[in-house]
């Protein structure tokens, strides 16, 4: 996949703290200002110049912007987790380290668990992140499984059940009320009907581990 989206990274210098903006590739998305400001505030840098940030994002060029005084603490690689409203997906985005350490699989699983993600974790998608370490990019690290609806029980009849009460019409236009075709002729041993039991379907689950039941079906005795 590679790094297509624009992203940002802290740069800690002797005299001040900067945020470095990396431009998007041709097919990539620019930085979302809300995502950037939330990241800065989360790391104790609320005194940024919003207009300067917006102008830098719109230029889509590599640049550094001062966002605060010296910030001596190292920043580790981190991940945000957003669980969809229906809890069927957990979308994660990663942010690069600044002098700190990168995340490993155990830390990713820990952060997913901390956000209530207990089921449907996609190990292959986690490995995909490690291959490219694409930042400010959506990775669907967990998916729920939709239930499979079943079918009602049914009876299949092996004789004519479509009773037609219309009298037989003769060639001369008259009708014969004695021929109503309401009787099916059978012999001993003929299979008259077969009961097909209900199919209850297959249960699903969301990423929070909650069971999702299929639609209720009708049974027959």
Label each residue range with its predicted role:
Residues 1-221:
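Long, low-complexity, mixed-charge
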């Amino acid at each position: 996949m590679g790094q297509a989206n624009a992203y940002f990274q802290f740069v800690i210098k002797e005299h001040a703290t900067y945020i470095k903006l990396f431009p998007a590739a041709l097919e990539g998305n620019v930085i979302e200002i809300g995502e950037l400001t939330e990241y800065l505030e989360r790391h104790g840098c609320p005194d940024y110049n919003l207009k300067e940030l917006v102008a830098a994002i719109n230029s889509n060029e590599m640049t550094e912007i001062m966002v605060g005084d010296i910030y001596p603490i190292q920043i580790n690689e981190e991940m945000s987790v957003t669980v969809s409203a229906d809890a069927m997906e957990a979308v994660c985005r990663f942010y690069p380290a600044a002098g700190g350490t990168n995340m490993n699989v155990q830390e990713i699983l820990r952060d997913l668990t901390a956000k209530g993600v207990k089921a449907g974790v996609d190990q292959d998608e986690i490995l995909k992140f490690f291959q490219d370490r694409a930042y400010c990019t959506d990775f669907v690290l967990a998916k729920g499984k939709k239930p499979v609806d079943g079918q009602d029980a049914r009876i299949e009849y092996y004789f004519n059940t479509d009773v037609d009460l219309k009298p037989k019409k003769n060639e001369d236009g008259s009708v014969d009320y004695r021929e109503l075709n309401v009787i099916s002729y059978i012999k001993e041993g003929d299979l008259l009907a077969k009961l097909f039991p209900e199919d209850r379907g297959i249960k699903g689950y969301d990423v929070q581990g909650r069971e999702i039941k299929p639609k209720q079906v009708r049974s027959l005795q």
